[in-house]
């Protein structure tokens, strides 16, 4: 590993910002050629938006609304599609994405205000549509828990996707929501290979811990599924059967998947990560990612961008659906209950 490797960070570089005419670089003064090797510390800024619920306009996602209590994500996943969104805030999609974070402390109040408005029509709202709502700073900020308290108070359906074990903290609220089919949880598992996980998703829970969480949630009646995403050919595609089997054995009710795409600055960030960590696989992995998307690692075409196309994509999908049929037959996630929503909020809560 190179001497300037920043431990615990997925990105190892700062990418330029497409919205900025200036690009800052480090100048080594006094003729020294020493590289900056100290890992940048995480900084949290408070953001105060006017609204918090975002309509989802992408037709291939299957969601109506999303809510993100945080912008940026300390998990630092090298492949994360959300990195590019950090440029809208004047930051880099690289190291800034995982070190310059924004928290929205007003989110619970704004959620309550929006779902109580006269024109709100109840529909499931997904937490973590962009960045993980249980990333490490949630332990300090607690915004996600307060959001769940609002969902529970008004019996409003909510979906969650995460790769962090902190969700275990909120089992009390999730169990309450599950009693009326008001919650669905998706645990994201990309690899059971701990070495790969540590390199690719440096500040996430281990795969074994995520499987434990699936089991704990399932045992208390909280519907949970596994999200095997993204599939990266040449890195984790061969793990599909094992991941689905392990998740099913611990009580997961369903499974989903997407294939990787490297839009915007992701190509630069991920290829740099791949060269540093798996140089012997670089050509194969990048070539196969391009094969999934018509010859380019980038893909913005709805439908194809998350599924891929061609022979390789068909092989991946066949392996996934064969495994899903084998391990998840006669299992389904419950449909969201849209009838329990109470604008009066006269539901008794006692979560401590």
Predicted regions and their residues:
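Short acidic (Asp/Glu) and glycine-rich catalytic loops that position anionic groups and cofactors
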Residues: 88-91, 264-266, 294-301
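Conserved C-terminal portion of the radical SAM core fold
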Residues: 208-268, 283-292, 322-327
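Short, hinge-like loop/turn segments at secondary-structure boundaries
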Residues: 177-179, 203-204, 243-245, 272-276
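Conserved Radical SAM active-site core
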Residues: 35-71, 75-186, 190-198, 206-219
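Short, electropositive alpha-helical surface patch
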Residues: 141, 175-189, 236-253, 314-318
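Flexible, acidic/Gly-rich N-terminal and inter-domain linker regions that tether
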Residues: 1-66, 335, 352
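C-terminal accessory regions of radical SAM enzymes
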Residues: 274-352
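Short glycine/threonine-rich loop-to-helix capping motif typified by GTGT followed
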Residues: 236-242, 270-272, 345-351
